[in-house]
Regions:
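Short HxH-centered metal-ligating active-site micro-motif
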Residues: 58-108
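Short, flexible beta-strand-to-coil junctions
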Residues: 49-53, 91, 114-121
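Proline-rich intrinsically disordered, low-complexity coils
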Residues: 6, 21-22, 69-72, 93, ...
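Short, surface-exposed beta-edge/turn micro-motifs
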Residues: 42-46, 82-84, 109-111
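Divalent-metal-activated hydrolytic enzyme cores
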Residues: 1-2, 10, 105, 109-143
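Acidic-enriched, low-complexity/disordered segments with a strong bias for Aspartate over Glutamate
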Residues: 24, 50, 94, 100-103, ...
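Glycine-rich short-loop/terminal segments
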Residues: 1-78
Length: 143
């Protein structure tokens, strides 16, 4: 990743090596670490986390968006979820964006969690969305 200081690269590497709760989204300490780093970078930071709580990929985007690269095929199928959740920061007070929802739908992510970061680098609010079983009335996700 170009343009990052060695200390920022080390912080991203530490995030990659962290274990996240398998059942919960994150701990308070993990939210603070992610929020502080995102604010210091001035960019969204995201983690793709598997169902066992292991970080599979660290993503660094721009201030207003994050790009998820092509993922390995693995557990794909029309009805199957990928077994990954996206935990990422938003530097604005917006909740989950339309882009976040489209990523979840098209990549078949288990869930998308947006952590809002205030100007001082504190996590202030989070919002989550997950896919609903096919055949559910209305939208294919719950926010």
């Amino acid at each position: 990743m170009q343009g990052l200081k060695p200390s920022q690269l080390n912080a991203l590497n530490r995030l990659f090596n962290r274990r996240f709760p398998a059942e919960d989204v994150y701990t308070i300490e993990q939210a603070r670490e992610l929020a502080l780093l995102s604010r210091a970078l001035g960019r969204q930071v995201g983690l793709l986390i598997d169902r066992k709580g292991r970080v599979q990929m660290v993503l660094v985007g721009e201030a207003g968006s994050i790009l998820i690269p092509e993922l390995p095929r693995g557990r794909t199928g029309q009805e199957r979820l990928r077994g990954l959740r996206l935990l990422h920061t938003h530097l604005s007070p917006d909740g989950i964006s339309q882009e976040d929802l489209m990523d979840m739908l098209f990549l078949r992510l288990d869930a998308v969690i947006a952590l809002n970061v205030n100007p001082t680098g504190d996590p202030v609010q989070w919002q989550a969305a997950h896919l609903l079983p096919s055949g559910a009335a209305g939208k294919p996700y719950h926010l």
